[in-house]
């Protein structure tokens, strides 16, 4: 970025939005190829390009915000509104899945046997792995808040410990979810129950992976002394996102696992 005599957000030309879009195209195409032709090459190519884009884009943002001082108060205000709008859009994204679930379950059609869960579907016990997953995510919400308070108080060591614990809990949740999927007595092909269950919980799982990655970057930055007690914008946004993921899971648990079973 050239020298500027104002505090406003002027973004340098960047290739990363384009490479990110190409990665998204390759991954969605790769997913279709994997489903129909059992080949994962295109999917792996998309994932590799996405990984490279993430690393380079994060590097640029860190350089601009931490080392060049471009994240002035007006810039932070704009980024804050951007994150609020992004999370709002995510709320509506998940609202569509809940709508589909309740539309199907509150008035089951004769094709489903007139009951919910549909005839022949054996739902998962909500008081086994799903309840453990709920406890894990709620605990991670506590640890991320602990990390935030430690950061604001200038307690570097505790912030690192709490953030490490949060990331580990995030990955533990993902492992439990993968195990649950592997052992589930129904598949995504099992009618409206299977599709609403796997799409809603699957997209939530994807958001947990994204949030865990976001927090892992924050952990690495905290270890590198990038955050101060006054300026830790990236961490705050990651914490917001993590709390959003927590709340979505509570709705999923109550709706799909507990009430829906």
From Swiss-Prot:
Mitochondrial intermembrane side: 35-40, 106-128, 184-190, 257-261
One Pfam family recorded for the sequence: COX3
GO cellular component, one term: mitochondrial inner membrane
UniProt subcellular location: Mitochondrion inner membrane
The protein's name in its UniProt record: Cytochrome c oxidase subunit 3
GO molecular function list: cytochrome-c oxidase activity
Keyword Lipoprotein among record annotations: no
Entry keyword set: Membrane, Mitochondrion, Mitochondrion inner membrane, Translocase, Transmembrane, Transmembrane helix
First-level EC class: translocase
EC number: 7.1.1.9
Family recorded in the similarity comment: Belongs to the cytochrome c oxidase subunit 3 family.
Species the sequence originates in: Squalus acanthias
Subunit structure comment from the entry: Component of the cytochrome c oxidase (complex IV, CIV), a multisubunit enzyme composed of 14 subunits. The complex is composed of a catalytic core of 3 subunits MT-CO1, MT-CO2 and MT-CO3, encoded in the mitochondrial DNA, and 11 supernumerary subunits COX4I, COX5A, COX5B, COX6A, COX6B, COX6C, COX7A, COX7B, COX7C, COX8 and NDUFA4, which are encoded in the nuclear genome.
Annotated TM spans: 16-34, 41-66, 73-105, 129-152, 156-183, 191-223, 233-256
Job description of the protein: Component of the cytochrome c oxidase, the last enzyme in the mitochondrial electron transport chain which drives oxidative phosphorylation. The respiratory chain contains 3 multisubunit complexes succinate dehydrogenase (complex II, CII), ubiquinol-cytochrome c oxidoreductase (cytochrome b-c1 complex, complex III, CIII) and cytochrome c oxidase (complex IV, CIV), that cooperate to transfer electrons derived from NADH and succinate to molecular oxygen, creating an electrochemical gradient over the inner membrane that drives transmembrane transport and the ATP synthase.
Gene that produces this protein: MT-CO3
Cited Gene3D superfamilies: 1.10.287.70, Cytochrome c oxidase, subunit III, four-helix bundle (1.20.120.80)
Membrane topology value: Multi-pass membrane protein
């Amino acid at each position: 970025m050239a020298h500027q005599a104002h505090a406003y957000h002027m973004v340098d030309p960047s290739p990363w939005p384009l490479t990110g879009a190409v990665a998204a195209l390759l991954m969605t195409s790769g997913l279709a190829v994997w489903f129909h032709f059992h080949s994962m090459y295109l999917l792996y190519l998309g994932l590799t390009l996405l990984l490279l884009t993430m690393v380079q884009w994060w590097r640029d943002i860190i350089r601009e915000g931490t080392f060049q001082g471009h994240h002035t108060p007006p810039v932070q205000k704009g980024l804050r509104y951007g994150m609020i709008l992004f999370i709002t859009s995510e709320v509506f994204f998940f609202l569509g899945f809940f709508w589909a679930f309740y539309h199907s379950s509150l008035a089951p059609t004769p094709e489903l046997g007139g009951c919910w869960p549909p005839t022949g579907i054996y739902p998962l016990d909500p008081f086994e792995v799903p309840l453990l997953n709920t406890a894990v995510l709620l605990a991670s919400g506590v640890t991320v808040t602990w990390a935030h308070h430690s950061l604001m108080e200038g307690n570097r060591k505790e912030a690192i410990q709490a953030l490490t614990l949060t990331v580990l809990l995030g990955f533990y949740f993902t492992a439990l979810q993968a195990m649950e999927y592997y052992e589930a007595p129904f598949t995504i092909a099992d009618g409206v129950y299977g599709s609403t269950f796997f799409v809603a919980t699957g997209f939530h799982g994807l958001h947990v992976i994204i949030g865990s990655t976001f927090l892992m970057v924050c952990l690495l930055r905290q270890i590198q002394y990038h955050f101060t007690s006054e300026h830790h914008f990236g961490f705050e946004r990651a914490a917001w996102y993590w709390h959003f993921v927590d709340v979505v899971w509570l709705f999923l648990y109550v709706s799909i696992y507990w009430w829906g079973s």
